[in-house]
């Protein structure tokens, strides 16, 4: 789970602050492909001549997944997303496991004292991802236009830091960053240099699902406010709503339905009815969002159960 709930409730355990010190050597990469469906774990030092990154394999679209606070690179929701990406679109999926820096060892105690440490670690992990991207581009000749980052919670901001760093390294921009309910605590007043921002990739898509644990302002080219972005159907805990962003995207990848975003100017305005949606005004959440011309804020109605469709049969 990626659970910041007690941080907001102020019920901090005043025990010993956990040690979530970042060390690049602790990072593992879980790599999934059609012939490695259950994933294999790699360390950075063997990446330079790893046969999985042959030309045939590396020519595919690549998705780099980045988890959040208290989580791991092979958490069940990311595992389901990785499998959907390889099954449906034959992606090469690389999930960045920075669990020590994300305080996963303390997840069972729901200890949030390490949160500020984890926040600080996001920049280091972002740099790691950018350096790994440099290897893909320079050694394996992967075009930047083939690489997208998908980050949940703190992982969304980490993706933003990676996006800034690859530009600093003169590699260009990632094709896309998808921020899944980007973390709110410690980022509530942050400006672009210190969080995920629409300039961090060619296209930045944000899916907002919890106003308590996520940011409640626009960060992307498109910002989807699912069920108004406050909380999600069927969820009583903020952590459930926070995690729903991952599940929604996985269903969108499976293409069983289009979660339609309809223009929504501000919290005090009424969104345009889905029935009035056209391809040039509304946007489908997911990997093809970039193919729609509209930008800005969108309200997304959803059902309680997967595949969460609530689009009145409208086809965009």
Curated annotation (Swiss-Prot):
Main location per the UniProt record: secreted
Top-level taxon: Eukaryota
EC number per UniProt: 3.1.1.32
Disulfide-linked positions: 20-103, 192-197, 235-240, 257-284, 258-309, 277-282
UniProt keyword annotation of Iron present: no
Entry annotation: catalytic residues: 153, 181, 242
Pfam families noted in UniProt: Lipase
Compartments it resides in: Secreted
GO biological process, one term: killing of cells of another organism
One cellular component (GO) term of this entry: extracellular space
Signal peptide: 1-4
GO molecular function ontology, one term from the record: phospholipase A1 activity
InterPro entries according to UniProt: AB_hydrolase_fold, Allerg_PlipaseA1, Lipase, Lipase_N, TAG_lipase
UniProtKB keywords: Allergen, Cytolysis, Disulfide bond, Hemolysis, Hydrolase, Lipid degradation, Lipid metabolism, Secreted, Signal
Reactions listed under catalytic activity: a 1,2-diacyl-sn-glycero-3-phosphocholine + H2O = a 2-acyl-sn-glycero-3-phosphocholine + a fatty acid + H(+)
Function as written in the Swiss-Prot or TrEMBL entry: Catalyzes the hydrolysis of phosphatidylcholine with phospholipase A1 activity. May act as an allergen and induce hemolytic activity.
Family: Belongs to the AB hydrolase superfamily. Lipase family.
Name recorded for this polypeptide: Phospholipase A1 3
The organism of origin for this protein: Polistes dominula (European paper wasp)
